[in-house]
Amino acid sequence: MSFIRLRLFIVLAICCIWSVSAHAQTIISGHVKDLQGEAVAGATVLLYSDSLLTPPMKGYAITRKDGSYSISPKSGGDMWVQAKCLGYKDRKVKARVMPESTDIVMEHDERSLSEIVVKGTYTGIKIAGDTVKFDTGHFSNGFENSVSDILEKLPGVSVSEGGNVSYGGKTVDKLLIDGRDLFTRESDGLVIKNMPADVVAGAEIIKNYKDGTPGSNYGRRDNTALNIKTKGLGRLSGYADASGGYKDKYNAKSFTLGTGNRLSLTAILSGNNTGTPVFSLNDYLSHMMSGSNVTASGQTSIKISGAETSLLYRPDNLCKDMNNIATLNAKYKASDRLEINGSLLFNHSDTHSRTERDETYLSADTLVRSASTTDNRGNFLTAKLAADWRPTDKAQLRWNIKAGMSDISLGTAATNSGTSGTKYDNTAKNNGRDIESNVSLNVSAGKGLLFVNGNFAWNDDKDRSMLTTNRRLLPVDYGTADNGGNDFYISQHRTTHRLSIGSEAGYSLNLMKCVSLNASVSQQHEQNTLRLTSEQTAGGEDKIQTDEYSANIFARNTKGALKVNAGASVTVERSSITGRQSENRVKVYPSLSLSYDFSNAHSLSLSLSRTKNRTETAKMSALTLIDSYNEMTATSAIDTPFQTGTSLSLNYNNYNTASQTYLTVYANMQRQDHALTPVVSQEGTTSTVAYAYGSHADNIYAMANLEKRLSAIPLSIKINLMANYVESPSVLNGMDNTSTLKSLKAKAVVASNFRSMFNGEVSLAYSRHISDIASSSIKTDISGIDAGGKLYVKTGRLKFTASMAYSHSKTDTYRYDIYDVGLCLTLKKVDS
């Protein structure tokens, strides 16, 4: 009996060992051939864990005479193979595990032999296919504090205040750290602005980036990724600093970065009352809004209340500015096929400002000087949860839900000089709640991709306002009260509800391996309700309901120097507004873009499209809305929420690494048909505005960036030019009118990059803004000059920065000059 048990034990042990061995054995195999089907012998096949080919390799092999190869990696998960051979272009494909074959087709490259010889001065840039590699050490001088500071010194790269990165005028879609997608989309900007510069070893811009998902090969446009190479990140890293100053000034910040095999997170605590921004408009949009709020034609609809606007667009006249923020973003890779991420953000802001301005009254052709103080307090709390599941290699399911709350209070006290002699206090409170969710499914079917998307959004905003004044200027029934001389008041309570539900289904495929075709049908239903309660004006309710049904088709070629992207959306638009006739119409929104690549670093693109924008609910309402102590909005004549127009854009990039000259030119012209036109009835200093259709409105914007690095001495020169022209129609007391705004900005910066303890930079900027109202002799002309310089000194662990700045601005009525001197001493502590 014991012998039988022993035999059984041995058999079970062998089976277990065999099963474990079989489970652990993963084989990647296939053949490498050229376009004619001939075997490529002697090619090197490298195996990596991601599409960026981030070291270390998982394995490699040399192809045999018949072009075959076989690799047995030590670990599993997603894998990519790269084939390299002299005389052929490098080829990269996603690996398939046996019994499936990972075959690779390589293309002859006649230029490969000539590219072996490198001549000229070292530029710190290497262009290989769709990847631009930067030697960040070549461009930095050691005084950079964050990743953002380093990126801003790279040719062609720009970073916005919120941390959004652009390359050649195009937004970067994905942030990678050492080839890994570690962070949530909401936290990318925070990482860029807060990750220490000391950890950066290099940077790469990857054009035509693909993440290996089923839908990555069928997008309507190419995606761009930024890969930050580090010197090595610990599982938990970060920093904290705090400072204080005169008149109870404080500035504190902490940044925590956690990276692991499955879990990565970022946490930021930041606050100050010195005016340093910690929460920008871009941060607000990325956390409070989402891509789910999209109409059937692909347009994004974003609405921001007046109280939100006053909090997010921070003016220059703040005499008190406290801002605190706490964020937590985490991404967890539950398995090779399931990824979960979430984010949480809280922001508190408290500001106080003083303003003196000239108010224009066209009916009397006069200016009245107004002085005011404003207190603004606000809180935001948002949370998001998302999941990305790939049940098979051919399917991907994405889902996310986002919830947000806002609480904003605004108080203004003002007095007017001159003939008006008016003073008033205005208190406004805004409470907002919103929930948004979307789900998408991508499935590889046949020779293409089947995709289905759905979205849901709900918003509830409550605005309460109380205006007290010493004069009754508006044609409404004021209430009476004793409030320090302000004996009259107007109170209003607005509630806005929004519900949006949409869906889209379509199919994408690649034809002849060079043309991508995308066809879909979509629908979007939206309902906006505005309720008004007031003691002084008639209350009521307005409902605006829209339905869009679209058929969309787009095509683009993916190979060749000349690329064409063309398509159109045919949309049936139905809208109804309370008390007005419903409208049905059919519109076509075509788009065409052409781009030509003279080389990997030299390109020109043109795009032309018909556009659509949504009109704000308040500008379509039949209700009487009080906007200010002397302004009100009356019944609107707008009967459709859709405003159409035309957009024309040009983008030119020339990155000459040999001469180290980098030029980017971008221009855009937008024309709105039958523009939304304010019809102003003005009597003295009182205005009533109603909106109607008018002539077209134009907005022309042009920008040019030139960067030049001198080879004789380590100096870099950056020149930025920006021009803007805006023309919009209006009607004043029955007379057609046109308002124009002309803006010009120019800035030049010269910075040194010596390999020594001393460096510096000088800058000079000029700006001018001219606004002109055709029906009036009143014209505003504001010009300014800003000059500055910085001296950097570094020795060992000690860094010293001295700065000087001068700012000059003048108009027809005032002029100011500001001088600024700053000193900063930093001692870096190094633990052995």
Which residue stretches match the model-derived regions?
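Membrane-proximal, glycine/serine-rich, low-complexity loop/turn segments characteristic
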Residues: 25, 35-37, 68, 89-96, ...
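Short, acidic Ser/Thr/Gly-rich low-complexity loop/linker segments typical of extracellular
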Residues: 52-68
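Structural motif
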Residues: 29-41
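A short, solvent-exposed loop/turn motif at the edges and junctions
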Residues: 50-56, 78-94
